[in-house]
C-alpha cells in the first residue's frame, strides 16, 4: 500500500467515526443525572429561564404491571449506552424500552419514532409511572428519544428513566432545561 492510499483510508475512517458519532448524539440525546437531594438545584432551572410547566397529577396508585415495569427498568440503572443496544451489556433509548416491556409480555416496536404511535396518546397531566415520554432531541417535532415515566414527585415533577448517550441508563427530570425543551408527548401502552 502506498502513502496516498494509507492517507485516503485514514480520512475515510475519520469520516465514518464522525458520522456514527453524530448519529448517536442525534438518535438518543444526552442528559445530566438528577440529584437525589430534594434541595439540590442541579436538576432545576433558574427562575429567569422560561420553561414549560410539565407536571402530572398522578394520584400515587400503581398497578402490579406498572410496578413490574419500573422494577425491571431500575435493574438497568448504570448500564452503559450502546448504539443499537438492547441487552444488559448496553442500551440505546428504544432498546431499553423494548427490553423492559418485552420482559413484561408487551411487544413494542424497536424504533422510538414507531413506539410514539403505539398505545394511547395522553396529556402529561395524566401521566403515571410506566407511561412513555417522547422527545425531539434535535429540535423540531421528529421523535428521536424515549423514556419511561419513573416517578411523579409530590409537586407534580415528572422523572423518567432512559438511556442517555453520555451517561447510560439514568433517571432525569422534565424540569431539566434540555428535556423540558425537547419534550413532545406521552403515550400509555399498559
State each model region's role.
Residues 33-68:
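Post-signal peptide N-terminal segment of mature Sec-exported envelope proteins
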Residues 49-54, 74-83:
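Acidic/histidine-rich, surface-exposed loop or edge segments in extracytoplasmic proteins
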Residues 60, 79-129:
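Catalytic cysteine-centered active-site loop
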Residues 106-167, 176:
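...with weaker cross-activation on analogous glycine-rich loops/strands in unrelated enzymes
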Residues 23-27:
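C-terminal motif of bacterial Sec signal peptides marking the signal peptidase cleavage site
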Residues 2-16:
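Bacterial N-terminal signal peptides that target proteins for export
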Residues 2-5, 29-41, 58, 149-190:
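Aromatic- and glycine-rich peptidoglycan recognition patches
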Residues 66-70, 74, 94-98, 127, ...:
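Extracytoplasmic/secreted envelope proteins and their assembly/folding machinery
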Amino acid at each position: 500500500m502506498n502513502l496516498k492510499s494509507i492517507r485516503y483510508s485514514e480520512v475515510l475512517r475519520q469520516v465514518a467515526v464522525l458520522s456514527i458519532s453524530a448519529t448517536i448524539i442525534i438518535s438518543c440525546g444526552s442528559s445530566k443525572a438528577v440529584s437525589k437531594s430534594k434541595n439540590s438545584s442541579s436538576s432545576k432551572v433558574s427562575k429567569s429561564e422560561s420553561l414549560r410547566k410539565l407536571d402530572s397529577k398522578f394520584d400515587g396508585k400503581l398497578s402490579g404491571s406498572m410496578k413490574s415495569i419500573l422494577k425491571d427498568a431500575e435493574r438497568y440503572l448504570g448500564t452503559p449506552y450502546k448504539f443499537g443496544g438492547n441487552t444488559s451489556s448496553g442500551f440505546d433509548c428504544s432498546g431499553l424500552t423494548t427490553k423492559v416491556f418485552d420482559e413484561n409480555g408487551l411487544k413494542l416496536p424497536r424504533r422510538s419514532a414507531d413506539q410514539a404511535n403505539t398505545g394511547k396518546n395522553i396529556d402529561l397531566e395524566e401521566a403515571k409511572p410506566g407511561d412513555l415520554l417522547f422527545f425531539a432531541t434535535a429540535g423540531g417535532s421528529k421523535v428521536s428519544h424515549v423514556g419511561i415515566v419513573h416517578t411523579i414527585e409530590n409537586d407534580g415533577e415528572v422523572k423518567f428513566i432512559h438511556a442517555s448517550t453520555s451517561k447510560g441508563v439514568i433517571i432525569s427530570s422534565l424540569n431539566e432545561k434540555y428535556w423540558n425543551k425537547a419534550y413532545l408527548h406521552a403515550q400509555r401502552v399498559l
